[in-house]
Structures are given as C-alpha cells and as structure tokens.
C-alpha cells in the first residue's frame, strides 16, 4: 500500500495531494483547492509570485494607453528586469536557473522561479526578501516544491503550438537573448575554469552535464524542441549513442586487424558483403588444401 501511494504521489491519480502544486508550485484554485498543497519548509527553489509586470499585461502588444508596443521594446523591458533580478539574487549564492512565466492566468502571471545551487543560499535569499519592494510593489516570496522544470514547463509552448495560450496551467517560460544569458551565467563557468587551473583534475562542467542542465532548466534554452532534437541526433546523446560509438570503434579495429593490402576488401573500400566473405574463405581453404597436397 505504501509503495502504491508513493508511486502515485503528485500525479492525477493522487486524490489527496495537488499535482499542479507539486509540479508547478502554483494552483489555479489557490487555498480553495480540494487537494493538499504541501508547502516545503526548505528548498533550493524560491517562487516570487506575480513579480514581473509586463508592459502589455492588460492587452498583449498594447500598452495601458491603448498604443501598440514594439516587440523589441517589450523584450528589452523584460531583459532589464531579468538582469536586475539576477544581479540582486546572485548576491546570496550561485543561481542554477531563473525562470519567468509568460502566462496570463492570475496564479501564473509574472511568476519568478529562482533555483540556487544550495538550499541554504535559497534560505538566505528568502530571509533578505522579506519586506522588500520592487517597482513599488511588495515582493511575495516563498519556498517552491519545483526542482525539476521539465515537469513544470509546457512542451507545446516550446514548439509554438500550445492551443491554450496564456491561460495554460503549465509554465510558458519567457527566454532571454543568448548574449545576456552568456553574460550572466557565464560568470560561473569562468569561475569553474579558474578553479580547475589550481587543481590537478578539472571539475569544470562537461558537455554532457551541460545538456542535462539545458533539459532540466528552460532558462538555459533559446531554441525549440525541434532544434534541440536536431542537435541531439547530430551529436548523439545518452547510453545508446555511447554503445553505438563503442561498437563502431570495435568493428573498425577488428576490420583493421583482419584487412591486409594483398587481400583488401570490396573495391569501394567499404564493408565486405556476405558473398565476398564466403568467396574469400573458400579461396583460403583451396590454397590451404593445395599446400597440404603439395607437401604430401
């Protein structure tokens, strides 16, 4: 029974705990939800509720006076906010991800999720944010149960085909430019490189770990799933690709041991066919029989 309850915890089958709060840290029913919202007492992730106020939040693409807004100005406004927030929160420790929702529903609009490397860093930031204001509005911060943003983000939105629009109950993460992301998160990579010079063994982030971070954290992503899949299949990833490369190396080394200039393979230099192999083996057998008969 305990194993069954553990397996369905935080899923739609769980009739006790709210799956949306467990995955996203927010629920459209709020305190009126019929299921439990288990608020963590400690977490590496903080939720700053409704903190980002987009200039076109009343009507998308139009300001409060009804004038159309240039999309570039909207993005510039967002990136200024993103950088301000990153610089302030970065004082408390290393930030692994900073995600800002582009949703329009009341329980999601402007939500900011900041994930620190350590829980005590998040606790220090939470304490410092108590009673603080931003742009004349109080900052409402609390620990969030979200630690894996793959379960919280909307995959259809990342592929530009979410039919629920801004009122989707999964996170529509607004992305920053590559230059700003490199500027802010690149400082951690530089510190890793500096630290690795003083140690005999480098502890810098490997390409595989970087791919894992990109999948886990949407703020490190600036292209769609289709683009990412192209990169995935181009470079290979995971256990299958490693097994495939090992098998190819093994086959290649075996082929080098067996091949000789006199008895080369197929004319095209490629892998021999089964008929060619059989013909070559029959030729070897005939040569061996002729030698044995001659010796007799």
UniProtKB/Swiss-Prot annotation:
Matches recorded under SMART domains: RRM_1, ZnF_C3H1
Biased segments, Basic and acidic residues type: 209-254, 272-296
Keyword Transmembrane helix appears in the UniProt entry: no
The RRM domain, residue ranges: 44-146
Pfam families noted in UniProt: RRM_1, zf-CCCH
Compartment(s) where it occurs, according to its Swiss-Prot or TrEMBL record: Nucleus speckle
GO molecular function, one term: zinc ion binding
Zinc finger annotations (C3H1-type) as residue ranges: 12-40, 148-175
The keyword Nucleus appears for this protein: yes
Subunit organization: Component of the spliceosome. Homo- and heterodimer. Interacts with U2AF35B, RNU1 and SR45.
Name by which UniProt lists this protein: Splicing factor U2af small subunit A
Name of the encoding gene: U2AF35A
């Amino acid at each position: 029974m305990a194993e069954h309850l553990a397996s369905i915890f935080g899923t739609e089958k769980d009739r006790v705990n709210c799956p949306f709060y467990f995955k996203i840290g927010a629920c459209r029913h709020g305190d009126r939800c019929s299921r439990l919202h288990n608020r963590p007492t400690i977490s590496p992730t903080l939720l700053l509720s409704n903190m980002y106020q987009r200039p076109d939040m009343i009507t998308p693409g139009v300001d409060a006076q009804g004038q159309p807004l240039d999309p570039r100005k909207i993005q510039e406004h967002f990136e200024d906010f993103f950088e301000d927030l990153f610089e302030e929160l970065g004082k408390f420790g290393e930030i692994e991800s900073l995600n800002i929702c582009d949703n329009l529903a009341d329980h999601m609009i402007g939500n900011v999720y900041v994930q620190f490397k350590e829980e005590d860093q998040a606790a220090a930031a939470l304490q410092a944010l108590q009673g603080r204001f931003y742009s004349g509005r109080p900052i409402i911060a609390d620990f969030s149960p979200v630690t894996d943003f793959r379960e919280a983000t909307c995959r259809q939105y990342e592929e530009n085909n979410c039919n629920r629009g801004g009122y989707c109950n999964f996170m529509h993460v607004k992305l920053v430019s590559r230059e700003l992301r490199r500027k802010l998160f690149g400082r951690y990579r530089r510190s890793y490189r500096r630290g690795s010079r003083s140690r005999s063994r480098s502890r810098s982030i490997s390409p595989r770990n970087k791919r894992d971070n990109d999948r886990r954290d949407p703020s490190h992503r600036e292209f769609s799933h289709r683009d990412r899949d192209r990169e995935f299949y181009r470079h290979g990833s995971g256990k299958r690709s490693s097994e495939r490369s090992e098998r190819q190396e093994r086959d290649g080394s075996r082929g080098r041991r067996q091949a000789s200039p006199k008895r080369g393979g197929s004319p095209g230099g490629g892998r021999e066919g089964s008929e060619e192999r059989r013909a070559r083996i029959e030729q070897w057998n005939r040569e061996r029989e002729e030698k044995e008969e001659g010796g007799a």
